């Protein structure tokens, strides 16, 4: 009986050790890590320096960019685009000078320039090492990485991020969308 208890105890210890090593080899879940970084950035927003820029040519009715910096690093950029039939806000989040997350919210107006929001759509984009690793579409479902538009959206978002970071760091009070 004692031998059985010892064998079971040893086996459980070996299995627990193997499971811990397997989890350590995989590393932490990148989505969970990004969510924690996102929350930490938003908690610290009041302490960050803000840089405001006017956005020209990105939307019909203009726009505004606000960059939040911690020391020399940009940790968040909020770009708001105004249009006749709605308003869109893109929030870009950065860790170690790398894009990690974009939250896009589009508020649709019931009538032109009314300001009365009748519908809102949201998209969430998760990045790791300059690659889009997850996209949660406006229906709340994950968009497949093999979907035809996935690579195009990734390229467009990375280009926008670079343009906004470069614009926020420039001395120019405006950022222009040059086709």
Feature map (PLM): residue ranges:
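Aromatic-rich beta-strand edge motifs centered on tyrosine
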Residues: 67-69, 91-96, 123-129
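N-terminal secretory signal peptides
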Residues: 23-84
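An exposed acidic His-Trp-rich patch
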Residues: 100-139
């Amino acid at each position: 009986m004692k031998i059985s208890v010892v064998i079971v105890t040893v086996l459980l210890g070996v299995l627990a050790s193997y499971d811990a090593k397997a989890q350590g080899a995989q590393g932490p879940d990148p989505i969970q890590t990004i969510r924690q970084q996102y929350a930490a950035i938003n908690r610290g927003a009041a302490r960050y320096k803000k840089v405001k820029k006017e956005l020209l040519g990105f939307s019909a009715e203009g726009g505004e960019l606000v960059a939040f910096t911690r020391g020399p690093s940009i940790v968040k950029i909020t770009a708001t685009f105004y249009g006749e039939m709605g308003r869109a806000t893109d929030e870009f989040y950065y860790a170690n000078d790398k894009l990690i997350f974009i939250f896009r919210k589009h508020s649709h107006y019931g009538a032109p320039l009314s300001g009365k929001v009748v519908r809102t759509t949201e998209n969430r984009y998760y990045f790791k090492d300059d690659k889009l690793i997850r996209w949660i579409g406006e229906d709340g479902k994950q968009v497949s990485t093999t979907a035809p538009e996935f690579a195009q959206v990734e390229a467009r978002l990375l280009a926008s991020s670079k343009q906004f970071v470069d614009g926020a760091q420039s001395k120019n009070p405006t950022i222009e969308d040059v086709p």
